[in-house]
From Swiss-Prot:
This is Multidrug resistance protein homolog 65. Gene3D superfamilies: ABC transporter type 1, transmembrane domain (1.20.1560.10), P-loop containing nucleotide triphosphate hydrolases (3.40.50.300). GO terms for biological process: establishment of glial blood-brain barrier; renal tubular secretion; response to insecticide; response to toxic substance; transmembrane transport; xenobiotic transport. It catalyses: ATP + H2O + xenobioticSide 1 = ADP + phosphate + xenobioticSide 2. The gene is Mdr65.
Length: 1302
């Protein structure tokens, strides 16, 4: 639809803050965490409370294990050294342990130690069972609620966006909602799922363990825990900084995603003007802020991790020294305040609590990220639409609508450009059943009237009346159900032809669909297609020619049988014969209903009951055609500017009515019997009826989504990823060394810890203090080394991962934009699907060399070193401790397998949801005009619910497997120390070696479990890498010739200059059963202007696309001068010779100057050249009249300009290129007659001295061509200049006569 006045966001010269911003998108502070659960039902709140209780129960096992472990190890020291019972114990006596002994013999101590071991094993087994059961619910409950939450979030966000008014969409054009629905919502899910349960478990565990430590020994606890406030503050500020960095990162990625969508949806324009390299560079520039923010996040994470772990070992050093001093001071006191048991409980309570707090850091980061992502999303969700299309409010007329329309003193300006006034007191009255044409220069406000009547916008002042009632009083759905519109640039949706027509009347029968298509002149070409009405039309109708799309759009409007028909350049893309047929159908359809016509064609407006000439936002003239011609005013001048002169002899020859009708019938028959076909093809087909169509499309998608993916070779994929990251190898090597060092450090601490128990057993206080001092210094050294290597490990792997992600995004985008155009015709490569791959899989791949790989290397190092140390001290106990490893490894492998099987299907369904979202939001005007809001919301909801099902299947065993891994470690503690106690009681093992072996191996196995938990992320990274490498490895079918291009003697002797098509046979790759060109031969000599004419869909534009090498012919050759464009010229060499102005010009979300300069991406185009090109295209005057002139932003896809203004910018863009060959594909179809004459003069001047190929239905634009070629049945059937073809009296002459009389 035409947009009549520039209405853009701020120019580049203005700051971002000055630019108008859509409501709900203003920057704001992150929301409170609990508000993330705002979409929970009462039942889900109950589940959350239950999950919280389970987390608390699970947390209680921590202090219980601390007490049990401390009591047992204290008894171990007492029994082994025959000190007697130095501590009162409370847990061990529950199952026969903890007997009090005084002056007992070694045998009695050994028997008591045996009982202690059995009691310890039973108690810890009970704790393991409790942890297992509570752990299952603490994971699954939060995952379940989070999944339901984000499903609702996605649906509510999409629904809110779809329900917003068009003015809001104009302002929000830079916001990438599709990416937000995928990435941002997924980050919210990550922040409110099982991580909440883990966080509650850690915090509650911290509180309880610290409280118990204080209750047992407040002096030691106070001394050791003095650093905990520092830990809490550090976590708080790190989370705060990372939240801000995350917001910056998301903003950058949103900009990159928006650019990617714009470029991929406009790939033909990008390719035509050689913009691939510059767009890739712009995309990379968008990624820079995100990369820098991520690097800072990595640095903060590394610093936090280093400080927390260093403080942990420092506290151990302090606890060792201070605790031993307290015990020695109390050795000779009868009522001892500190004993080994109390020391262990207080010490372990603080260590476990501090470790819990340290482990909350990544969770806090996830929560901060979730809050940041949710802030703007929730504002959009909460936003109340000013014009809500799904509102049930408003009046519905039960008695029917008459159709009286009146614009009453209307003042209007677009929300995105409030300083530009479009209407200035517009007054128009249209009686029911009248046909009224709105005319005027391009950009005067005609199409704005159409949009106001549809209530896309509301007037700033004044009112639009329908049956004497302000349209704001009517229900919007009811209002739009009585209005049908056919726009200048028709938008069709991915699906079948039948489905697209039925969108005008949901539930229409096949008979009604065919009747509407016949009335619109589309039935003939549809039935000539192999799949007829079941034929798929591609994304945005890409499988159809412009004329075919327009006829489908007209059929879609006619099937609605509206009270008011709005025709905004409805026949601009049709040839004149088709236009006559369709115009007759529209004239017939106009009977009995109010019709408003916006057109530059005299044939479309001459028969109107009233013609309204609009100038400067006001009505300048109105009346019938004859009245206005008699007035000889502005309308008269506009009509005269479009007159076409014909030779007198031809007029006489064809003056007899019968002869004219016979000629028309012959011409019509010749076109109707030709093999009308798609200009591009499709893959799938479905049945006719609407319900069956949707069911079969859904089934097809389901089969596609559920098809087993090609199994990737993980080793080869990982090798390629490492090769891709070779620039970061030095970081990876140093990071690997650091990760290995971290893995070695804990076994070293376990040995120190075991020696500390030996120090407690020293009877001489001096020896005990001396050994403790050495161990404390060793802990200090360990703290320093741990801090250093932890920082390096986290930062370096994050650094390498971020660079890999950034590089992979850029490389994938580069590979996409360099594919041949036919690749984008495949529905599997829709814009939404490709954007989802860029934003999703390129992020997933970071797991291959980022933190997951780091954790796995650390765990492997730790496990190997732990096994080595344990085997050194006691191989029997070591093997027993390793018994839980198969359980852990098996659990993780099982989980990884289940997740990897679901991840590809999940991504495919998400891509389909993204396609629906992208298609709907991008074409929101068409969605609104067709009242499809509820339909697209339902379709999107169905896909998102399928995503929920797949994720639920993926996570169904998550709680069990996670709890198995954690509980198995506790159970292993029970078995290991129980058996170790037996060995000590039998004199086979020193007691301190039990501590060394068990601590070393059990921590190693837990680390193995934690690292193997990264396996799903690592597996997902390899799957993502495999899918991205498929894109990177794909060689475009259209490439520059290989090797050196030779200048052969034959080429030197070939003196031909110009463009030559020889024996061209062609079918579109996605439509191999439909032949487009059948042996076409055509020569365009250097400097000639050659026009191609023929029926809509005959293949005229195909000739241009083959010349641009969008496709290559199946047979035959195309030459530019003496060079075969396939074998003798590079792609760039071909396209730099060409300048294109297409029927539906695509402009970018940039300034007018940047869009014009886009015509030549090989160099920096000066402002002088830009202005000169604009003047040549008759665009300079309207550009400088804008407040920001050439710096005016264009809006998404140039929506801030009228159709005529966009076309003139496109012409200027082609002229600035100074091409050798100029291609004009309906270059003036969107212009009013006056502007067309001026622009045509400019084009005539531009064509002077260069070769031009012109495609046009309006013969006024081609009558001065040197050669005119009529294409029929894929061949040139007539050619000559205008006078020659007229004198021949053939097809062209009859077509010309038709237009003259029309």
């Amino acid at each position: 639809m035409e947009r009549d006045e520039v209405s853009t966001s701020s120019s580049e010269g203005k700051s971002q803050e000055e630019a108008p911003m859509a409501e709900g998108l203003e920057p704001t502070e992150p929301i409170a965490f609990l508000k993330l659960f705002r979409f929970s039902t009462y039942g889900e709140i109950g589940w959350l409370f239950f999950g919280f209780i389970m987390c608390c129960i699970k947390a209680l096992t921590l202090p219980a294990v601390v007490i049990i472990y401390s009591e047992f190890t204290s008894m171990l020291v007492d029994r082994a050294m025959q000190f007697g019972t130095s501590s009162n114990v409370h847990a061990l006596p529950l199952f026969g342990g903890g007997k009090t002994l005084t002056n007992a013999s070694r045998e009695e101590n050994n028997e008591a130690l045996y009982d202690d071991s059995i009691s310890y094993g039973i108690l810890l087994t009970i704790a393991s069972v409790v942890m297992f059961i509570s752990g299952i619910f603490s994971v699954d409950v939060f995952n379940m609620v989070a999944l339901r939450q984000v499903t609702r979030m996605r649906i509510k966000l999409f629904s809110s966006v779809i329900r917003q008014d068009i003015g809001w969409h104009d302002l929000a054009s830079k916001q990438n909602f599709t990416q937000s629905m995928v990435d941002d919502v997924e980050k919210i899910r990550d922040g409110i799922s099982e991580k909440v349960g883990h966080f509650v478990y850690l915090v509650v565990g911290f509180i309880i363990t610290v409280a118990i430590s204080f209750s047992y020994g407040w002096k030691l606890t106070l001394a050791v825990s003095s650093y905990i406030p520092l830990v809490i503050l550090l976590n708080y500020y790190v989370a705060k900084f990372q939240g801000k960095l995350t917001a910056r990162e998301q903003e950058s990625y949103a900009g990159a995603g928006n650019l990617a969508e714009e470029i991929l949806s406009s790939i033909r324009t990008v390719v035509s003007f050689g913009g691939e390299k510059s767009e890739v560079q712009r995309y990379e520039n968008f990624l820079v802020p995100a990369r820098k923010a991520s690097q800072w996040k990595g640095a903060f994470s590394g610093l936090s991790d280093a400080v927390l772990k260093s403080m942990l070992y420092l506290s151990c050093a302090g606890a060792f020294w201070y605790g031993v001093n307290l015990i020695i001071d109390d050795r000779n006191v009868e009522n001892k305040e500190y004993t080994p048991a109390i020391l262990m409980i207080a010490f372990f309570g603080i260590i476990v609590g501090a470790d819990n707090i340290a482990r909350t850091a990544p969770f806090l980061e996830s929560f901060a990220t979730a809050r940041g992502c949710a802030t703007n999303l929730f504002k959009v969700i909460d936003l109340t639409s000013k014009i809500d299309p799904l509102s049930t409010d408003g009046k519905l007329l039960n008695y029917g609508l008459r159709g009286d329309v009146e614009f009453q003193d209307v003042f209007f300006r677009y929300p995105s450009r409030p300083e530009v006034i479009v209407h200035r007191g517009l007054n128009i009255r249209i009686r029911a059943g009248q046909t009224v044409a709105l005319v005027g220069s391009s950009g005067c406000g005609k199409s704005t009237c159409v949009q106001l009547l549809q209530r896309f916008y509301d007037p700033v002042f004044g009112s639009v009346l329908l049956d004497d009632l302000d349209i704001r009083k009517y229900n919007i759905q009811w209002l739009r159900s009585n209005i049908a519109v056919v726009g200048q640039e028709p938008v069709l949706f991915l699906g079948t032809i039948a489905q697209n027509i039925s969108y005008g009347k949901p539930g229409a029968t096949q008979k009604e669909i065919e009747a509407a298509a016949t009335q619109a002149g589309a039935h003939e070409f549809i039935t000539n297609l192999p799949e007829s009405y079941r034929s798929m039309i591609g994304e945005r109708g890409s499988q159809l020619s412009g004329g075919q799309k327009q006829r489908i759009a007209i059929a879609r409007a006619l099937i609605q049988n509206p009270k008011i028909l709005l025709l905004d350049e409805a026949t601009s893309a049709l040839d004149y014969q088709s236009e006559k047929q369709v115009q007759q159908a529209l004239d017939l359809a106009s009977k009995g209903r109010t019709t408003i016509v916006v057109s530059h064609r005299l044939s479309a407006i001459r028969g109107a009951d009233k013609i309204v000439f609009i100038h400067d936002g006001k009505v300048l003239e109105e009346g019938s055609h004859d009245d206005l011609m008699a007035l000889e005013g502005a309308y008269y001048n506009m009509v005269r500017a479009g007159d076409i002169n014909m030779p007198d002899e031809v007029e006489k020859e064809d003056s007899i009515e019968d002869t004219k009708q016979k000629s028309l019938a012959l011409f019509e028959k010749s076109f109707e019997t030709s093999p009308l076909n798609f200009e591009k093809g499709q893959k799938n087909s479905v049945q006719f009826e609407e319900p069956i169509i949707k069911a079969l499309i859904k089934d097809t998608n389901a089969q596609s989504a559920e098809a087993p993916p090609e199994k990737p070779n993980f080793f080869r994929t990982f090798s390629r990823i490492l090769q891709l990251a070779k620039q970061e190898w030095c970081y990876l090597i140093l990071g690997t060394i650091s990760a290995v060092a971290v893995g070695f450090l804990y076994p070293a601490f376990a040995v120190i810890f075991g020696e500390f128990y030996a120090a407690l057993a020293e009877k001489d206080p001096e020896d005990a203090l001396r050994r403790t001092a050495v161990l404390s210094w060793a802990c200090l050294g360990l703290a320093f080394l741990t801090g250093l290597v932890c920082f390096l490990q986290t930062y370096l792997f994050n650094y390498a991962g971020i660079w890999l992600t950034t590089r992979m995004r850029a490389m994938t985008f580069n590979a996409m934009v360099n594919q041949e155009v036919g690749w984008f015709d495949d529905e599997n490569n829709s814009v939404g699907a490709l954007s989802a791959r860029l934003s999703g899989e390129a992020v997933d791949i970071q797991g291959a060399i980022g933190y997951p790989l780091s954790g796995m290397i650390q765990a492997l190092s730790n496990f190997i070193s732990s096994v080595s140390v344990a085997m050194y001290y006691n191989w029997k106990l070591a093997l027993l401790c390793l018994a839980n490893c198969p359980i852990i490894v098996g659990s993780v492998i099982l989980e990884a397998k289940m997740m990897s099987n679901a991840v590809v299907r999940e991504k495919q369904v998400i891509e389909e949801a993204c396609r629906i979202a992208t298609e709907s939001i991008t074409n929101i005007r068409t969605v609104a005009g067709l009242r499809r809001e509820a339909d697209v919301i339902r379709e999107y909801t169905e896909e998102i619910q399928r995503v929920e099902v797949l994720i639920r299947q993926k996570l169904r065993w998550r709680g069990v497997l996670n709890s198995t891994m954690q509980a198995s470690a506790f159970f292993a503690y029970a078995v290991a120390l129980c058996y170790g106690g037996v060995l000590v009681s039998e004199g086979q093992l020193p007691f301190q070696d039990i501590i060394k072996v068990s601590e070393t191996l059990l921590y190693g196995s837990m680390m193995l479990a934690q690292s193997l938990a990264f396996t799903p992320a690592f597996s997902a990274a390899l799957i993502a890498g495999h899918r991205l490498f498929q894109i990177l490895d794909r060689k475009p079918k259209i490439q520059s010739p290989m090797g050196t291009i030779k200048n052969t003697l034959a080429k030197q002797l070939n003196l031909f200059e110009g463009v030559r098509y020889r024996g061209i046979q062609f079918r579109y790759p996605t439509r191999p059963d439909a032949k487009i060109l059948n042996g076409l031969d055509l020569e365009v000599l250097k400097g000639q202007t050659v026009a191609l004419v023929g029926h809509s869909g005959c293949g005229k534009s195909t000739c241009v696309q083959l010349l641009q090498r969008y496709y290559d012919p199946d047979e035959g050759t195309i030459h530019i001068d003496h060079d075969d464009i396939q074998h003798d010229l590079t792609l760039d060499g071909v396209r730099t010779k060409l300048g294109i102005v297409s029927q539906e010009p695509t402009l970018f979300e940039r300034s007018i100057a940047e869009n014009i300069a886009y015509g030549d991406n090989r160099r920096s185009v000066s402002m002088v050249e830009i202005i000169a090109a604009a003047k040549s295209a008759n665009a300079h005057s309207f550009i400088i009249s804008l407040p920001n002139g050439y710096d005016t932003r264009m809006g998404a896809r140039g929506t801030q300009l009228s159709g005529g203004q966009k076309q003139r910018i496109a012409i200027a863009r082609a002229l600035v290129r100074n091409p050798k060959i100029l291609l004009l594909d309906e270059a003036t179809s969107a212009l009013d007659l006056q502007s067309e004459q001026l622009v045509q003069q400019a084009l005539d001047t531009a064509c002077s001295g260069r070769t031009c190929i012109v495609i046009a239905h309006r013969l006024s634009t081609v009558q001065n061509a040197d050669v005119i070629c009529v294409i029929q049945n894929g061949q040139v059937v007539e050619q000559g200049n205008h006078m020659q073809l007229i004198s021949q009296g053939g097809i062209y002459a009859k077509l010309h006569k038709t237009q003259k009389d029309h």
